[in-house]
Amino acid sequence: MRQKIVAGNWKMNGQIQQVTELVSQIEELIGFDCAAQVAVMPPSIYIPKVRDCLKTGKVVVGAQNVYPKDYGAYTGELSAPMLKDFDCRYVLVGHSERRQFFHEDENFVAQKFHHVKDHGMIPILCVGETLSERENGKTEQVIAQQVLAVSAKGKDCFRDCVVAYEPVWAIGTGKTATPEQAQKIHQFIRDLVGEINDSDAKHLTLIYGGSVNENNAKALFSMPDIDGGLVGGASLNAKQFVEIVKCIN
């Protein structure tokens, strides 16, 4: 059975009081048996604080970014061993904002992906097309390139990882793919991975990220190949985020 996941990407938002209150409210509101693994990904400076605030075991902490070296002269960066010291379970790699603003290419994303796996954490590989790429019929071509970039290490590379489909045109815009559009791409990704390792494809957790909110989550999560969500803006509101989590049930 595939792991269901709802992950909140807080991006560069919040200060210590807001972060503390938000994570405490989320835990308090999840007073039910949850079918999904719930994760929050605060700005890296607040990872220790969030970890220390988590009391119930119903929410885990993750990281938004990583640098693919264990240590060294890489000013301002954080390695997987450092993140693991603070109990990070998930790490985002390849988010469209990293690709766009920091010019991270496929090779660099692949290095991050395997660096996270090599240190016993779970990478969430983000893939997705821009509006221009979609309008030009290149969606599957772009996503295949992004997915297959991490496959150089062999047929087991998609074991113990998550892939998030985040159409770039839907991030922070209020637009979202229809459940049917999202399902089509999720099925494409699963079939693509199946060409490498059929067993891993069947067990691969695929989540959708692209303006997920409490109004569209239930329809999205009802699709057969959508196993949860990567939530942006709505994860900064505890009530909205937990309403999304409830939709997994």
Curated annotation (Swiss-Prot):
Pathway: Carbohydrate biosynthesis; gluconeogenesis; Carbohydrate degradation; glycolysis; D-glyceraldehyde 3-phosphate from glycerone phosphate: step 1/1. The keyword Membrane does not apply. Signal peptide: none annotated. Substrate binds at N9, W10, K11, G172, S211, G232, G233. InterPro entries: Aldolase_TIM (IPR013785), TIM_sf (IPR035990), TrioseP_Isoase_bac/euk (IPR022896), Triosephosphate_isomerase (IPR000652), Triosephosphate_isomerase_AS (IPR020861). Homodimer. This is Triosephosphate isomerase. It comes from Legionella pneumophila (strain Paris). The lineage of its organism: Bacteria, Pseudomonadati, Pseudomonadota, Gammaproteobacteria, Legionellales.
